[in-house]
Design a protein with these regions (language model features):
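Bacterial N-terminal signal peptides that target proteins for export
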Residues: 1-9
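Bacterial N-terminal signal peptides
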Residues: 8-18
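Boundary at the C-terminal end of the N-terminal hydrophobic targeting segment
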Residues: 21-23
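Von Willebrand factor
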Residues: 26-86, 112-119, 132-138
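Extracytoplasmic/secreted cell-surface and envelope-processing proteins
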Residues: 41-44, 75-80, 142-148, 172-176, ...
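Short beta-strand-loop
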Residues: 64-99, 115, 121-126, 145-147, ...
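VWA/integrin I-like adhesion module and closely mimicked acidic/polar interface patches used
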Residues: 140-186, 190
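C-terminal "exit" segments of structured domains
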Residues: 198-217
Length: 217
């Protein structure tokens, strides 16, 4: 009786293997890249564009890519940098690169958490992907977001979104730098992603991408 039960269970397991393999093969990735175009990134914007293109080159064959940045809204000290989609769900590397080339630095108070929440909504609006990857190229400053970090992390987990980040925090002053590092480290860790903080005056692109280790399967 035990032998028959064992054989039956073994047969059921073997029959289920093709379904498991198909499910793994059908796993789909989708990427959203946030390029921080706020004023605090002005002196680093050249390397920001290079990093964005390097990421596009690495991931575009593995799933659709969307590019997001900020637009300035309002005037003076009360102006805000609000998130906007520049191009959505394409695997055309040339088109993505041209979109990146068209970006420029704008004013306004940064809303980083709001931007991530906005990206989550836009990526979620299109069915098909089983895992969504948000990639931030930013100094990590957030000044006037209305979205709360705890609420955002909960939404991201529910939506199977992992946050990866390249934190260009070198030019921030002490207190601001510590706050930015803490925010990016927490966001990426809690969502199953990773953050890289390049050191020194020169950013080694390939070393950063290798350490970031974006999902591409």
């Amino acid at each position: 009786m035990r032998r028959n039960t064992f054989l039956l269970l073994s047969s059921i397991f073997l029959l289920s293997l093709p379904s498991i393999c198909i499910a793994q093969q059908n796993q789909k990735l989708e990427y959203g890249i946030l390029i921080d175009t706020t004023g605090s990134m002005r002196s680093q914007f050249g390397i920001v564009s290079v990093l964005a293109k390097a990421i596009v080159h690495q991931v575009h064959d593995h799933g659709p890519v969307s590019i997001f940045s900020f637009d300035s809204e309002g005037v003076g000290r009360g102006s805000r940098a609000v998130p906007t989609a520049r191009i959505e769900r394409t695997q055309d590397e040339d088109l993505l690169n041209r979109t990146i080339d068209g970006l420029y630095v704008q004013g306004g108070q940064t809303t980083l958490l709001d931007a991530i929440e906005f990206m989550d909504k836009r990526l979620r609006a299109q069915a098909g992907a089983t895992d969504r990857i948000i990639i931030l190229i930013t100094d990590g400053e957030d000044r006037v977001s209305t979205e709360k970090q705890a609420d955002l992390v909960r939404k991201l987990k529910d939506d199977n979104v992992s946050v990866y980040a390249i934190g260009l925090v070198r030019e921030l002053e002490g207190g601001k730098r510590s706050k930015a590092i803490k925010l990016l480290t927490s966001l990426t860790k809690e969502t199953g992603g990773r953050v890289v903080f390049p050191k020194g005056d020169r950013v080694e692109i390939q070393a950063v991408l290798s350490e970031l280790s974006l999902p591409i399967q």
